[in-house]
């Protein structure tokens, strides 16, 4: 239900993430997209910037909607309200700290470091795509160092 979700998305948060109230209200509910999300995240790797936060948030939202973590032998299928979060979970913030000669590891700083546009920074889709790009750039940088 959208009403439940709206309690967790303030106007300020929507603005930071570049959503309008209309876009938020027109978007599908978590219940509608949960089966597809569960299917996509059960096989790793999962790459994120401070990925532990993202994983905890996903677990929290799944639980709020009555999903349970699947046991090792349970299948994640549409309608069974189970989820698994895949491995490995790769944290680009930690990789930047370990491998890059930068003082800061936040995503915007890494965008600047790798000449990635800041135009839509904080929009969920852009952040996800840029995080993937940062991951590849860190791996490329590290392979050239060796």
Question: What spans do the regions from the language model cover?
Answer:
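Conserved non-catalytic scaffold segment of RNase H-like nuclease domains
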Residues: 1-59, 108, 112-118, 122
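Short alpha-helix plus adjacent loop in nuclease-associated cores
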Residues: 76-104
